[in-house]
Curated annotation (Swiss-Prot):
Organism from which the protein derives: Aedes aegypti (Yellowfever mosquito)
Name of the protein in question: Ubiquinone biosynthesis protein COQ4 homolog, mitochondrial
GO biological process, one term: ubiquinone biosynthetic process
The protein's Enzyme Commission number: 4.1.1.130
Membrane topology: Peripheral membrane protein
Length: 274
């Protein structure tokens, strides 16, 4: 079974979803292990190794203090994405456990948890996606990223969690955020961000998504707020509820898929924006 344990060589496979780095052979660090050890020991995947190397362990008191501090900072300045990310790690464990269970109960979700794919410029061949037909999800994703001058490398690493698998679920949420924007056809302006936060809140269930949606709306200008209440909010609540569970979608296997077919498959409703 191929695991994404190392991303050493960029390889473009002409099958749907394989526009990312794969490891042909796993390097376990030794040529052979004793038979009993080999059966008992499972190789640690690359994500877990990297996470444990950078993990910052907290006591319960430290976690409470960090949660309170990041909450206040995020309320004072919703642009503090670092504080919002920190808040998500220190308060979102029950929701992440629910998401993980949902993924385990889905064939596609289980495969994601097993492979632990990453989305960044080291693992996704953006140039290859750019050469796909314009109607494909992969082409639309690259076009979205270029239009709004976004890089997939900008997502913060998860550091303050105890469980590596839950840390991956949080990482997966962060790294697929722009894919959600793409498939819902929603821009990255303030109105679009608040709307997508509502979609994610309803569909995924992370507390930080609810917080971002509620408090982000206070930053809207009066004219934007009217448009938000009349069009964007009703759409976001409806779209988040109707869509298939977004965390169970193996997006990387959909690069070559027609984006309208993908939307139909995932039951995604697109709002016509000005």
């Amino acid at each position: 079974m191929l695991r994404q344990t190392a991303f050493r060589s960029m390889k473009l496979n002409r099958t749907p979803g394989r526009y990312f780095t794969t490891a042909e052979n796993m390097d376990t660090g030794s040529s052979q292990s004793p038979p009993d050890t080999e059966q008992k020991m499972q190789p640690m995947d690359e994500f877990t190794k990297e996470f444990l190397k950078n993990q910052i362990k907290l006591t319960e008191l430290q976690r409470v203090i960090l949660s309170a501090g990041s909450s206040i900072a995020a309320l004072v300045d919703p642009r503090r994405h670092d504080m919002i990310a920190c808040l998500g790690e220190t308060t979102g464990v029950p929701a992440l456990e629910n998401i993980r269970d949902q993924m385990r109960n889905s064939d596609e979700g289980r495969q994601i948890l097993e492979d632990k794919p990453r989305i960044n410029t080291r693992t996704v061949n953006m140039d290859a996606l750019k050469k796909l037909p314009e109607n494909t999800f992969g082409y639309q994703y690259v076009s979205f990223m270029e239009k709004y001058e976004i890089t997939p490398d900008s997502r913060m690493e998860v550091k303050f969690m105890d469980d590596p698998e839950l840390a991956y679920v949080m990482t997966r949420y962060r790294e697929t955020h722009d894919l959600v924007h793409t498939v819902f056809g929603m821009p990255t302006n303030m109105l679009g961000e608040v709307a997508i936060k509502w979609v994610e809140a309803i569909n995924i269930g992370l507390p930080m998504c609810y917080g971002g949606a509620i408090f982000g709306a206070f930053r809207l200008r009066p004219k934007q707020r009217q448009n938000y209440l009349q069009r964007y909010l009703p759409w976001a609540l409806r779209a988040g509820q109707r869509a298939r569970p977004l965390m169970c979608v193996y997006w990387e296997k959909r690069w070559e898929q027609d984006i309208e077919e993908l939307r139909k498959e995932l039951n995604i409703e697109v709002l016509k924006v000005d």
